[in-house]
A protein has these predicted regions:
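Short hydrophobic/aromatic beta-strand micro-patches
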Residues: 46-48
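Catalytic core of pol beta-like nucleotidyltransferases
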Residues: 1-25, 34-39, 50-102
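Acidic Asp/Glu-based divalent-cation binding sites
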Residues: 42-44
């Protein structure tokens, strides 16, 4: 049986991984953000890449997130998204991590 996470549980797992990979932000959208996730739901995340400059670094982030959450992920980068789709998901997004600026 697969676990249905709360947003707080997802944030607790994702935030330290995001910080370790030095991304600018990670945001939850989709069924988990809307509160209607089921056991079969994947976790939809949008990432502002920050210092992730290549596919290997992005792949490492994905692997760490998937291992930490033990769930299938859709990890989308902000730069790869169509503006219309970005506007659509921004209505439901929940911030899981944002890099603190000094």
């Amino acid at each position: 049986m697969s676990h249905i996470y709360s947003v707080d549980e997802i944030k607790a797992i994702v935030a330290p991984i995001a910080a370790a990979h030095d991304v600018d932000g990670i945001y939850l959208f989709g069924s988990y953000a809307r509160g209607n996730a089921t056991e079969k739901s994947d976790i939809d995340l949008r990432v502002d890449k920050g210092r992730l400059t290549d596919l290997f670094a992005l792949g490492a982030l994905y692997a760490d997130l998937e291992e930490g959450l033990n769930k299938k992920l859709d990890l989308l980068t902000t730069g790869s998204l169509d503006q219309k789709f970005l506007q659509q998901i921004s209505k439901e997004e929940i911030t899981l991590y944002e890099h603190a600026t000094t």
